From Swiss-Prot:
Stored PANTHER family: PHENYLALANINE--TRNA LIGASE, MITOCHONDRIAL, PHENYLALANYL-TRNA SYNTHETASE
Top-level taxon of origin: Bacteria
GO cellular component: cytoplasm
GO function terms (MF aspect): ATP binding; magnesium ion binding; phenylalanine-tRNA ligase activity; tRNA binding
Membrane-spanning intervals of the chain: none
Enzyme Commission number(s): 6.1.1.20
Lineage of source species: Bacteria, Pseudomonadati, Pseudomonadota, Gammaproteobacteria, Thiotrichales
Quaternary structure annotation from Swiss-Prot or TrEMBL: Tetramer of two alpha and two beta subunits.
Family, per entry: Belongs to the class-II aminoacyl-tRNA synthetase family. Phe-tRNA synthetase alpha subunit type 1 subfamily.
Name the record gives this protein: Phenylalanine--tRNA ligase alpha subunit
Cytoplasm in keyword set: yes
Amino acid sequence: MQIVEQMKDKALAELNLVKDKKTLDDIRVKYLGKKGELTEMMKLIATLPNDEKPKLGQAVNIAKQALQEAINLKLANFEEQELNEKLAQEKIDITLSGVGQNQGSLHPVTKTLNRIEAFFKQNGFAIEFGPEIESDYYNFETLNIPSHHPARAMHDTFYIDETHVLRTHTSGVQIRTMEKQQPPIRIIAPGRVYRCDSDITHTPMFHQVEGLLVDKDVSFADLKGLLHVFLNSFFEKDLKVRFRPSYFPFTEPSAEADIECVMCDGKGCRVCKHTGWLEVLGCGMVHPKVLKAGNIDSEKYQGFAFGMGVERLSMLRYGIDDLRMFFENDLRFLKQF
C-alpha cells in the first residue's frame, strides 16, 4: 500500500509540471493506461493473501480516482486557457466606429407634395387624380382655351395624336370632378404634368398641385385668405403675400401670388432678381364657361381655383437653385434630405 501511495504522489508531482495537453495525456497513459503503472498494480492482487487483497484493491482505486480527478482538472484548465486565447484573437473592438448603413429617405419633391396635401386635407379638401394622357377636350376646350391659344402650339405641348396630349396641367381633373359631383366641392389635384421646356428652371416633366372650391357665396377674399394661410404654413413663417392681376383663360379675375423672398427676407437678391418678391402660384375665380363645362350653374354657384409647381416650392423651401438636380439621381444631393 505504501508503494501505491508513493506512485500516486509521484504522478501528482509530474502533473504539476505539465505545460500542455500532450504531456498530460502521456502521464495519463503512463499511470492509467491499459499497461499503466497503477493498472499493473491491480495484477498483483492475485498474488497476495486473501486478507491483503481488499486493502491493495482499495488503495489502487483511491489512487486512480485521485489521479484521474487531477488530470481532469488540469485538462479543464488547458481547455479554458485555449478558449480565452481564441476569444482574445477573435475579439471585436466595440470602441471602433461602426460601418455606416445607407439610410433611405423621401425625395424632397415627395416631401413637399406630402406637406401640401396634408395642409389641404386638414382644411377639408379631398384629393382627386386623373389620367396623364388627356384628351384635347379636357385639357383645353373645357378650360376655355380656344384652338388659337398659344398653349395649343406644338412647341408648348406634347401631342400623342390629334386629339390626345400629355396633360399640361391637372385642371382636367377639376372638370371631371365637377361632372360627377355637385357642389359643395373642395378638391386638390396633384400629379405629373408635361410641357416642351427644359432649362435651369424648367423641365419637360414636373409636378403640380391644383385646387378647386365650388360653393355658394364664394369670393376672391376667401381665395386670398386660404392661400395666405397655406403659404405661411408651408414656409413656417409669417410671410408678406401680394396678389398681382394676371390672365388665365379658365379664371376671371385671375391673379398671381408673390411672397416676400425667403432667401433674403425681401431685401433683394439674385434669386428674386433683386425685387424682394418671388412668384409662387397662380389663382383666380373660376370662369363661368368652365363651370358650365362641368355642369355647374354659374348663376347659383361660384368657385375659385389655384395651381402651384411642386418643384418650384421645393426649391424655395430647401434653397435649391437648379431644378434639374431633382431628376439627376445624385445621392450626394439626395442624402441632404
